[in-house]
Amino acid sequence: MSFLSEFEPLEEKLFSYEEQPAPSGKLYTRTAYVGAERVRDIVSEYDKETCRLPYCLENEWFFIGYRIGEGITSFLHKKSGRQLLKNGTEAFFTPLYERTEIRRDVYEERRLLGRNICGLHARCFQGTLQDIRILEHGPVFTRVELDFQLEGTAHSSVILKMYRHLPKIEFTLRIAKTLSEAIESVYLPLSLHLPEAELYIKNGGVPMRPGVDQLPGSNMEYYIADEGLLYRTDGESVLINTLDTPLLYMGPMEHHPIVLCDNREINNKRPVYSWIMNNTWETNFKMDLSGFGEFSYALELRENTGLH
């Protein structure tokens, strides 16, 4: 059972339920909306939404388009008409797998990484959308599962949950990682096309702009975020909660010269990724990434978002 209810600060509510009589229905509606195969793929006034779910999700605030073989084709902020989706490896809702093969030995290969998170000969693989499943469609939310073919995994899917009457999207990556001795990482892009926004995270309870509000000469490649990240603008801002994965990577998805922090504003405009899995640091992390995992996120719009 799902429903929406608004609460004032410190307000308490008691909910109860009771059996309701079944709603009356017409045996014959004279409306063609579903065929004998029980597939609702007919455009009709009776059901305007179900026939479109294999291609897109939409509410008052967002439009998400997707196509098998093409992946995510659109992530639209409807109020402004702005396309939030970025290209290449920054495409939202699309998982990435990166692998550096062991060509010497496991320790020497990791030493040669230096400050980079991948080797000079690393390869990055982007998930390819191969199937779409409608899990739930109701008056409160709709859930759609996007199945991706992703190197290094036996299963990879992203479940989108869009609320009908809230400016909020929840999304979950489900992954079955295969066994490999290579240096590996799994990412989910969190970059949005908001060039005027400032990117904030909370680190140690303190809001900061990565690449700007940190010590000169310090690392800018990866960060630990207490709760997630915020794209802050003068009006409406976008909050992304990284509920299960505090590690973020910022920068190009390739081996590159390392620039230490010089506090320039441009540092805050770099691509950002949720760094879900890695076995880069063998002293701190599990070397074997194989197994099943589920990692949840939530994106929502906020008006005049403060930093505390």
Write out the residue ranges for each language-model feature:
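C-terminal (or distal) subdomains of carbohydrate-active enzymes
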Residues: 1-308
